[in-house]
UniProtKB/Swiss-Prot annotation:
Single biological process term from Gene Ontology: translation
Segments of this protein annotated with the region Disordered: 1-28
Pfam families, sorted: Ribosomal_L35p
Gene Ontology cellular-component terms listed: cytosolic large ribosomal subunit
The entry's keywords: Ribonucleoprotein, Ribosomal protein
Name this protein carries in UniProt: Large ribosomal subunit protein bL35
Family affiliation: Belongs to the bacterial ribosomal protein bL35 family.
Disulphide bridges: none
Record GO terms (molecular function): structural constituent of ribosome
UniProt organism field: Acidobacterium capsulatum (strain ATCC 51196 / DSM 11244 / BCRC 80197 / JCM 7670 / NBRC 15755 / NCIMB 13165 / 161)
Length: 65
């Protein structure tokens, strides 16, 4: 069986933690920020975790992370 290839786009967006969870960044922070409240923008800077429903798909994209 050949080696699995890492999805390069996913590798730039996700990181595996020591416990096996997958960290991700929040969306909606690239542009059109003047209409967002400061509190909202501050909350969006924090990282989040990939949901259980998506965990298997993302884990397959980054097999060696």
């Amino acid at each position: 069986m050949p080696k699995m290839k890492t999805h390069r786009g996913a590798a730039k967006r996700f990181k595996k933690t020591g416990t096996g969870k997958i960290k991700r960044g929040q969306s909606k922070m690239r542009h059109i920020l003047t209409s967002k409240e400061t509190k909202t923008k501050r909350k969006l800077t924090a990282s989040a975790y990939v949901s259980d429903a998506d965990h298997a798909k993302v884990a397959r994209m980054i097999p060696y992370a």
